[in-house]
Amino acid sequence: MNNTNNKTASKPCLGPIEFISMFALITSLVALSIDSMLPAFPAIAQSFALADTKDTQLVISTLVLGMVFGELIFGPLSDTKGRKYAILLGMVIFCIGCVIAMNAQTFEGMLIGRAIQGFGVSGPKIASRALIRDQYTGAAMARIMSFIMMFFILVPMIAPSLGQLIITFASWRMIFAFFLLMTVSIAIWFTIRQAETLTKDKRIPFSIKAISKASKKILFEPVIMAYAITAGILFGALLLFIGTAQAIFQDIYAIVEHFPLYFAALASGVGVSSFLNGKLVMRYGMYKLSMSALIALGTFSSLLFIVSMLSDGQPSLFWFMLISFLCFCCIGILFGNLTAMAMETLGDIAGLGASIVASSSSLVSVVFSVIAGRFYNQTTIPLAVGFLCAAGFGIYLVYSAEQRKASM
């Protein structure tokens, strides 16, 4: 693997096993920060005496809102100050957010901590991708990323169980203590073992003008924005599910203690479909796969809506699990393809453009999930409608983007 390595660092890169292990942990921070909190929702609502339990969804939304701004800053910052600087700065900010959230005496105070966490975790999320790209190219990079993604896919499956384990023996605040301990440990390991990969002669001065120029180019480019908005809406639908899943399982199916196991089963759909997408995309292409997945998502969402309406909004656990699993499979296919299709047209502003696309998608996802989440009424109907709307908008936007590309 070292033969295909493209080294820009002054020190030799880590061995493949250590490198994969380190960056699998770094990239897992986002998913861990979201999914580990789900079992704690009832305890958080009780601790802060929330009048409306739907407000616990904001624990997820505010984290993603913080990422909206973080993704916009850390991309250019990693090109200016280096990958290592951006990753470590992001981890420090994330740890500050953990401390604030852990010690918050009000729900609003905890949400401020979560927003800071989201801003900070954008550093490792964005800069780690650039660092991997610095050190590996071609088949070697594809192999490294596939191993990292395998681990990343497992995190949503085990994170709720981890959160459940912590609150079984301690306060929900200790989940933030776990985040803090884990991040500090990774930061120490990363600082000692990983060299900077962006040498000073290759760094680009931080420029508000450049960010503004790139933003205008992307925001007024219909094709790029169509893919970015679609990705945001679909992530918003996923956040809608994540934000309401604990309540659905508790309110409708009286499942509390074993909720993490059911959530893990559903999350495995993303892993299965991501694996299949890697096999199928070279044969059928991103557009065909994406449109097929969107149409399938619309079909399954319609089925969930019909089943829900026929059962007063409370379908049997079997039907809910089956249809939700199939929806997760569709979303797993869509995420990677939509991002790749947006990146295809970025050209010479790919680095900065990736940050703007990610930030735009995150903003759309927050707006979608917060609005849709307020309609939760102890039935699965709002969830079905949310997925159906996401699929409908996605089909229209992706089809329109491809038509525009064909006419260019």
How does the language model describe each region?
Residues 5-13, 197-227:
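Juxtamembrane intracellular "pre-TM" segments in multi-pass secondary transporters
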Residues 18-50, 241-246:
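Extracytoplasmic
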Residues 40-69:
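Extracellular/periplasmic helix-loop-helix junction of adjacent transmembrane segments
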Residues 50, 82, 103-109, 120, ...:
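Helix-breaking motifs and short loop linkers at transmembrane-helix boundaries and internal kinks
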Residues 68-108:
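Conserved MFS/SLC helix-loop-helix module at the cytosolic interface between two early adjacent transmembrane helices
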Residues 85-99, 180, 289-304:
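Structural signature of the two symmetry-related core transmembrane helices
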Residues 109, 138-139, 143-192, 198:
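Helix-loop-helix hairpin linking two adjacent transmembrane segments in secondary transporters
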Residues 113-154:
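Cytoplasmic helix-loop-helix junction between adjacent transmembrane helices
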